[in-house]
Amino acid sequence: MSRIGNKVITLPAGVELAQNNGVVTVKGPKGELTREFPTAIEIRVEGAEVTLHRPNDSKEMKTIHGTSRANLNNMVVGVSEGFKKELEMRGVGYRAQLAGNKLTLAVGKSHPDEVVAPEGITFEVPTPTQIVVSGINKEVVGQTAAYIRSLRAPEPYKGKGIRYVGEFVRRKEGKTGK
């Protein structure tokens, strides 16, 4: 049995869920998200509780069941609380600047890297070496943060680069001379 798929999703106050031919729309205080779900998965709303049911116990249905429940829960959490990923920059001269919705990064290249915020994503730069990516769609927040990190991933010898806050970067020893 899919343990994740069987968990009940509780709708917080102010969050509404509407479904139409497999397309589910979740509205909340932070915004609105729409996603298409497999038609085999039945979504039942009873008051403030949402449950997902699958037609049979085949392996494929179990995986779709758990994934659908996780996606729906992420939509509910996104429109009620939102998601954020924090990144930090380490290295001499590494810094970030924000101008409107465009993030300019100086990360040791001959040119600055510019990242334009996708729709629904906001950037914050509390200090020149910290970046906060936030929004209501968990997937887009994660993809945007991963793209920013990929512009200069942390290297193992000195640890320079862009990393997630709290990320452990495994360090290596340099070559030993004669």
From Swiss-Prot:
Q: Which cysteines are joined by disulfide bonds?
A: none
An individual GO BP term: cytoplasmic translation
One GO term in the molecular function aspect is: rRNA binding
Please provide the record's keywords in A-Z order: Ribonucleoprotein, Ribosomal protein, RNA-binding, rRNA-binding
Gene3D superfamilies assigned: Ribosomal protein L6, alpha-beta domain
Membrane-spanning segments: none
An annotated GO cellular component of this protein is: cytosolic large ribosomal subunit
Claim: Translocase is one of the keywords in the record: no
Please give the InterPro entries that the UniProt record associates with this protein. Ribosomal_uL6-like, Ribosomal_uL6-like_a/b-dom_sf, Ribosomal_uL6_a/b-dom, Ribosomal_uL6_bac-type, Ribosomal_uL6_CS
PROSITE patterns, per database record: RIBOSOMAL_L6_1
Transmembrane found in the keyword field:
no
Subunit structure comment from the entry: Part of the 50S ribosomal subunit.
Q: Which family does it belong to?
A: Belongs to the universal ribosomal protein uL6 family.
Job of this protein: This protein binds to the 23S rRNA, and is important in its secondary structure. It is located near the subunit interface in the base of the L7/L12 stalk, and near the tRNA binding site of the peptidyltransferase center.
| Name used for this protein in its record | Large ribosomal subunit protein uL6
Q: Which organism is it from?
A: Streptococcus suis (strain 05ZYH33)
